[in-house]
Structure formats: structure tokens, C-alpha cells
């Protein structure tokens, strides 16, 4: 399959990730604990994967840092899904295409075109509407702040992966999941949560199983695609998560989604779409060489 198709599949799976997060929360793994359990399972499985392949665990420094930042973004995103409305969290995470465009222009030497200005303006305008509702006052809770930080970490990580040289997906998954676990441990420490938690120990085991069967495949698809697609292109393809995440959140959780939220969502999607209007950017890597 092509990188575009695999990135789209990853987006659909990311869009449904709130379901296991909320399910584990119901079992007693609140805050960052659900993400920590799943990422721990993904790390154990990816490390075993590398051992079986006997792959050298020495990726280029830039690729390793990029994978680690994606891991930070994964943990921030999982915590955001537990602390905020799924619809708002998913939409605010998708300021990532705007951050990606700025990073490409400032650090990767790609040109700034009129669609870039449209992407940035539409994304920021959409975020203001989603946060403020009536566009007169910004209201950002912990979930929204974590979602914004997650999108920024993702954008920087994707840019570093794209420009850091080719590395096997298994090795990158080790760095991504290990970083996600480390970030989750920081959250747990800040929250003063006992580790491992006494009551939901079985839930931790179930979370680790979900990490092996769900998170690891999605991470592998994501980091593999990130090395082959320009950051803004990848972020655009992953906006399929908006459709999946928002629709599933509205239909299954009955979360509020009024006219202002709909307009904000449309602006964010427009910002992502505008980046690919002039044509495919799969060959953007050539501009960096």
C-alpha cells in the first residue's frame, strides 16, 4: 500500500482511540494512566519486534528525536481525551497542519505560499471559535491545553522524522513508545498517583494488551508514513481523524456540537485542505536535498 493510504488508515484508527481511553478510564485508569498502560504494552512489543528482526537500534539523531516527540504528543493526546470533550480535543489537536507549515517554512526551507497563509488563518480562526463558542472569549480547560500541546509536539516530531533519514518502523516505534511511557510517568508523578495502582491492576494488564494490538500497529503506520510524506501533507491526511473522532464523539457521547463548533471545525479542515490544493506534495523531500 502507498504511504497516503496507510496514513489515512492510521487516521481512522487514531480517531477511534478515545474509545479504549474512555473504557480504561471506566475501569479506574484515569488521567494519563490509560495512555501509560497502552504505551507500555506497545513498548514491550516493539522492543521484542526489534530483537526478533535483530535491527540496529541506532537511528539518526534527528529521526530518534522526532520519534520521541511524537511519543510525547501521543501521551498528551491520550491525557487530553480523558480531561476534555472528545470533539473539542480532536479539533484542537488539528492545529498541527498550521504548526507543520510554519516549521517547514522556518526550518526545512520550503516556500511560503498563499495557501500557507490561508491554512494558518483558517486553523487559528477555527480554534478560536471552538474554544470561545461565541468568538468573544477564549475558554480553554486542561483538555484543550493538552490537545494544543499535543498537536505542536506532533508537528515538530513529524518534521524531524521527515528530514531525519530512513529508519525501520520497528526501531522508531521503540523510541516513540518509550518516550510516551516516560511522559506518562511524569504525568503520574505530578498527579501523585501510586504506581502500579492497587485496584486497577487488571485494567493495566488490559491496557497493555490494547497497546500491543491497537497502539503499536497505529504507531508503526504513523511513523512509517511520516518518513515518506511532508509534515503538512501527513497532517492533512490525518485530518480524516476529525471526521471519525467528531462524528463518533457526537453520536456516541452526545457531546455538544452547535453552529459555532461546526464553523470552527470547517475552518480547521479548510486550513488543512488548503495546503494540498496546488497539488500533491509527496515529492517535497526532493526540495530538501
Where are these regions (language model features)?
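Helix-helix packing/entry segments at the starts of transmembrane helices
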Residues: 5, 37, 90-95, 161-179, ...
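Transmembrane alpha-helical segments that form core, pore/gating elements
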Residues: 7, 11-23, 46, 100-101, ...
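Hydrophobic/small/kink-forming positions within alpha-helical transmembrane segments
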Residues: 15, 19, 47, 67, ...
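Membrane-interface helix-cap regions at the ends of transmembrane helices
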Residues: 42-59, 72, 124-138, 179-205, ...
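C-terminal transmembrane-helix exit sites in multi-pass transporters
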Residues: 50-51, 79, 96-118, 243-262
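Hydrophobic transmembrane alpha-helices of multi-pass small-molecule transport proteins
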Residues: 115-133, 260-278
Amino acid at each position: 500500500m502507498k504511504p497516503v493510504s496507510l496514513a489515512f488508515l492510521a487516521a481512522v484508527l487514531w480517531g477511534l482511540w478515545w474509545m479504549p481511553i474512555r473504557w480504561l478510564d471506566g475501569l479506574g485508569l484515569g488521567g494519563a494512566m490509560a495512555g501509560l498502560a497502552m504505551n507500555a504494552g506497545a513498548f514491550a512489543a516493539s522492543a521484542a519486534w526489534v530483537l526478533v528482526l535483530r535491527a540496529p537500534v541506532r537511528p539518526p539523531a534527528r529521526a530518534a528525536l522526532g520519534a520521541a516527540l511524537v511519543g510525547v504528543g501521543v501521551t498528551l493526546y491520550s491525557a487530553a481525551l480523558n480531561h476534555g470533550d472528545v470533539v473539542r480535543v480532536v479539533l484542537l489537536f488539528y492545529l498541527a497542519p498550521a504548526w507543520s507549515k510554519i516549521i517547514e517554512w522556518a526550518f526545512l526551507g520550503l516556500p511560503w505560499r498563499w495557501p500557507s497563509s490561508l491554512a494558518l488563518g483558517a486553523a487559528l480562526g477555527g480554534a478560536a471559535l471552538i474554544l470561545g463558542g461565541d468568538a468573544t472569549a477564549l475558554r480553554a480547560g486542561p483538555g484543550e491545553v493538552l490537545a494544543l500541546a499535543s498537536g505542536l509536539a506532533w508537528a515538530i516530531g513529524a518534521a524531524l522524522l521527515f528530514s531525519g533519514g530512513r529508519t525501520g518502523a520497528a526501531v522508531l516505534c521503540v523510541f516513540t513508545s518509550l518516550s510516551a511511557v516516560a511522559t506518562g510517568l511524569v504525568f503520574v508523578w505530578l498527579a501523585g498517583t501510586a504506581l502500579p495502582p492497587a485496584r486497577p491492576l487488571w485494567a493495566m494488564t488490559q491496557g497493555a494488551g490494547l497497546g500491543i494490538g491497537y497502539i503499536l500497529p497505529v504507531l508503526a503506520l504513523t511513523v512509517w508514513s511520516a518518513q515518506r510524506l511532508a509534515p503538512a501533507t501527513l497532517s492533512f491526511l490525518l485530518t480524516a481523524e476529525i471526521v471519525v473522532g467528531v462524528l463518533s464523539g457526537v453520536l456516541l457521547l452526545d457531546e455538544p456540537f452547535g453552529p459555532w463548533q461546526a464553523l470552527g471545525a470547517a475552518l480547521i479542515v479548510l486550513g488543512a485542505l488548503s495546503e494540498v490544493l496546488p497539488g500533491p506534495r509527496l515529492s517535497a523531500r526532493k526540495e530538501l536535498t
